[in-house]
């Protein structure tokens, strides 16, 4: 098949879960014998591309798209059916580039990476006879509804409750009724979509990177790590919760360190006052960061889809401590290959137990790695993907 993969960010460099998922999808399609072209946006938030990391044999095209959020744009969306956070990706140059590709190549399949690209559905349908499939990285209106519940009463909460969340819910439900197929990243998301449309659909998670292996940490300190972009509200709010409610109590009189890494640190974070915390900012090597931790924490309370960092850490044989939401959609076994907790008291108790019984870290990490290798093998997932698209 000749396949066009349309993305709202470059798949390289792989600095977040979405770019990793896109990059993996390109490779999975390629390994099944398909010829893949990638058309991606370069936005103000994600302006980079790393040509050295691109897959050989894949044609990559990029278009600069502003896509920045503004108050004026948010207010204007009150009078439009499309949520502003989606509408901001509409761009004439990107649209014309897409049309040129569709009219220049006879594609068999168009893969839109995320519901945000649904604004180009009509363009794809008009200029191509290819099957159109959306890969839903999340249920977006679920994320925003959960985020809304975390906010204090005010203008932002009112806007989300009365404008954006209802708009987004209608937009997502109407979009998936038009497409030819849907790929969800988690079975939880798939169950929602299955209630809304009868189009062919499947759940295919992000694969584990099986080339990686855990290495013993040599530092004398008990290291706990957090990895995530802090311009994403669930990460930011979850990190603050962990520091306030858990770390400030756990770290007292212990030789421990909490290392925080990720993109787009807000200035506010540098005003926080917590002991035994290292703010590392954006890092070059996420794998090395994970391998240097004894525990990876995922304290998020909103969002949907799948946390790629959980898959990565577990595949490296690391002990992951997460909220239930943080591990949602991933086949895990609480107490065996991961530790799940949702209250400060439970989190604190688990950390104290691991601090006193560090042999548990290796046992849980070993089980985690075993689970990732058996459940999230790239070859097995690529085979499922192949069966799905050939049946469309």
Regions of interest found by a model, annotated:
Residues 1-61, 103-105, 249:
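N-terminal subdomain of nucleotide-sugar transferases
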Residues 203-291:
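Conserved catalytic-core segment of nucleotide-activated headgroup transferases in glycan assembly
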Residues 72-84, 133-170, 229:
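Acceptor-binding helix/loop patch of EC 2.4 sugar-transfer enzymes
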Residues 309-312, 319-323:
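Short hydrophobic beta-strand element within catalytic cores of glycosyltransferases
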Residues 162-213:
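Donor nucleotide-sugar binding/catalytic pocket of nucleotide-sugar-dependent glycosyltransferases
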Residues 180, 291-305, 316-319:
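Acidic donor-binding loop of glycosyltransferase active sites
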Residues 334, 338-345, 353-358:
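Conserved acidic donor-binding segment of nucleotide-sugar-dependent glycosyltransferases
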Residues 360-375, 381-386:
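A short, well-ordered alpha-helix in the C-terminal region of glycosyltransferases
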């Amino acid at each position: 098949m000749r396949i066009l993969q349309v993305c709202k960010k470059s798949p390289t460099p792989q600095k977040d879960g979405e770019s990793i998922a896109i990059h993996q999808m390109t490779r999975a399609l390629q390994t099944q014998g398909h010829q893949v072209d990638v058309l991606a946006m370069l936005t103000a938030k994600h302006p980079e591309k790393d040509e050295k990391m691109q897959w050989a044999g894949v044609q990559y095209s990029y278009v600069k798209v502003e896509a920045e959020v503004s108050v004026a744009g948010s207010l204007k969306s009150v009078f439009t059916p499309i949520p502003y956070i989606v509408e901001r990706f509409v761009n004439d140059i990107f649209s014309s580039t897409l049309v040129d590709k569709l009219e220049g190549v006879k594609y068999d399949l168009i893969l839109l990476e995320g519901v945000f690209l649904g604004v180009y559905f009509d363009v794809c349908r008009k200029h191509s006879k290819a099957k159109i499939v959306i890969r839903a990285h999340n249920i977006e209106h679920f994320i925003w509804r959960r985020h809304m519940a975390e906010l204090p009463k005010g203008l932002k909460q009112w806007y989300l409750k009365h404008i954006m969340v209802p708009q987004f819910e209608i937009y997502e439900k109407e979009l998936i009724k038009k497409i030819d197929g849907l790929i969800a990243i988690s079975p939880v998301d798939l169950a929602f979509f299955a209630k809304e449309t009868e189009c062919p659909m499947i759940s295919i998670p992000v694969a584990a990177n099986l080339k990686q292996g855990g290495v013993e940490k040599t530092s004398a300190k008990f290291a706990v790590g957090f990895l995530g972009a802090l311009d994403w509200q669930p990460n930011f709010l979850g990190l603050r919760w962990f520091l306030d409610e858990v770390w400030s109590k756990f770290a007292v009189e212990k030789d421990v360190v909490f290392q925080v890494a990720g993109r787009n640190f807000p200035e506010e974070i540098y005003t926080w006052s917590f002991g035994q915390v290292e703010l590392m900012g954006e890092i070059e090597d996420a794998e090395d960061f994970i391998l240097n931790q004894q525990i990876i924490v995922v304290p998020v309370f909103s969002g949907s889809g799948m946390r790629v960092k959980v898959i990565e850490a577990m595949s490296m044989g690391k002990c992951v401590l997460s909220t239930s939401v943080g591990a949602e959609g991933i086949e895990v076994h609480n107490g065996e290959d991961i530790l799940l907790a949702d209250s400060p008291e439970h989190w604190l108790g688990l950390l104290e137990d691991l601090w006193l019984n560090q042999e548990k870290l290796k046992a849980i990490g070993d089980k985690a790695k075993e689970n990732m290798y058996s459940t999230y093998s790239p070859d097995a997932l690529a085979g499922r993907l192949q069966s799905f698209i050939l049946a469309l």
